[in-house]
Amino acid sequence: MRTLVVLGDSTSVGIGDPVRGGWRGFGPLLGESFADYRNFSFAGARIGCLRTKQLPSALAARPDAVVVLAGMNDTLRSDFDPSTLHQDLDHVVGALRDIGAAVVTVRFHDHSRVFRLPGTLRRALSDRIAELNAVVDAVVARHGIGCVDLDRLPGAYDLETWSVDRLHPSELGHRRLAAAFAGVLGTPAVSQECVGGVRITPLHHAAWLLVKGVPWLWRRGRDLFPLVVRIMRDARVAEPIRSDRSLPTGLLSDVVEQTAGDR
């Protein structure tokens, strides 16, 4: 295979694996086995962006192999719609297969375990990820493409796999991703030896969570709030009838504690 193309969001951009002048990430690591490597990803991209903004460039490149990694941004938005995601992802993969490209994508891990969200918000995000994975499974089955299950990636839930923000892979995490993609595509193995950057300690993670993590949680939590309310409502309906009809405010307390600092 000669040409590799990467489509996706900030993880595909390489954020979390800094090098002089920018980011590296799994793309260039995997791309070392190809004569030509092109990355059309950009931070904040959703699956719809791949269809409208990245796919045309990918098709023009006539790639032999394509990595498609996006969807997590969709799970964090209030307009999350699995039906639309399926249409967009199916279109992207179908168009790439039509030109003969080998395509590999991912099933997502439960990222709420990495970020350690409070209970009800964790459930909301986990439910969204499960719906996203159902979309991925359907597209993978229809087109017969490769798929890496991030939940089974070695060290998927180890802090060393993640950058200080816990949102993007660290250098080691990107190397693990690249190795998994190489295994599916049948290209040479990717070294797992980290050669740059600063080792991230639990103190780094704690400091980031305090300064930036809580504001991020508040912003994203607002988009997830309708789903949180629905989960609380469903849990309430499932409870045995009690004389005390007060709202289960205790279910919200863990969210409030995590978000109050951003006001």
Label every PLM stretch briefly.
Residues 41, 107, 149-152:
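Residue-level recognition of beta-strand->loop/alpha-helix junctions
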Residues 142, 165-263:
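Conserved catalytic region of serine esterases and O-acyltransferases that act on ester linkages
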Residues 84-87, 91-98, 131-138:
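Alpha-helical scaffolding segments of alpha/beta enzyme cores, especially the outer helices
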Residues 21-22, 80-87, 120-131, 165-172:
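Alpha-helix N-cap and loop-to-helix initiation/capping positions
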Residues 1-43, 53-62, 250-251, 255-262:
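Serine-esterase "nucleophile elbow" of acetyl-processing enzymes
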Residues 13-17, 48-86, 110-111:
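Oxyanion-hole/transition-state-stabilizing segment in secreted/luminal serine hydrolases
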Residues 113-150, 171:
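Substrate-gating cap/lid alpha-helix
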Residues 98-103, 145:
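A short helix->loop->beta-strand "cap" motif at the edges of active sites that frequently abuts
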